[in-house]
């Protein structure tokens, strides 16, 4: 006999207990089980499962840009976005060879250039060749271009024969809508133009 005020629980062991718990779990609604469709009406849940990219796209469309150097411009580094390897997405635009930041926030900014040459001078005392690449910021907060990323290399004097130097830079910055990102390069005549060698871009985090 069960004492007054106490709930009688039958003893269930082993396999019977497992099936009992499984039955209780299956009887719960999707919201309680943490299954796909949590927090959504049945019709919305079905739509999300059938078209996940369309349903969640609004939260993933972040500004992004990837530019490549124009090989037809041998005396200057001009960026272009009209190739199949380059793009401007969700607000980014290219104006006067500068990327225009569409919204304020954190951005990863990156750039790479590759320099090459046939060899150093055969003179006993040759003049060093300095190479540099810089990503600059022009903002309404500053009346001049501010370096964000900067790297330098030098070649010659050195071993005879062809040489190649690559420079890659990337970091996270807090940018403001309307900021302009551009580059400055020393040693443009030695740039090795190809979409995989000379590029510049940024994307929102």
Curated annotation (Swiss-Prot):
Residues 1-34 form the signal peptide. Residues 63-205 form the THD domain. Coiled coil: none annotated. It holds the Pfam family TNF. One of its GO terms (biological process) is positive regulation of canonical NF-kappaB signal transduction. Keywords: Cytokine, Disulfide bond, Glycoprotein, Membrane, Secreted, Signal. It is found in: Secreted; Membrane. The keyword tRNA-binding does not apply. It comes from the Eukaryota. Disulfide bonds join 120-156. Its main location: secreted. One of its GO terms (molecular function) is tumor necrosis factor receptor binding. The keyword Transmembrane helix does not apply. GO terms for cellular component: extracellular space; membrane. Homotrimer, and heterotrimer of either two LTB and one LTA subunits or (less prevalent) two LTA and one LTB subunits. Interacts with TNFRSF14. Cytokine that in its homotrimeric form binds to TNFRSF1A/TNFR1, TNFRSF1B/TNFBR and TNFRSF14/HVEM. In its heterotrimeric form with LTB binds to TNFRSF3/LTBR. Lymphotoxin is produced by lymphocytes and is cytotoxic for a wide range of tumor cells in vitro and in vivo. This is Lymphotoxin-alpha. It comes from Marmota monax.
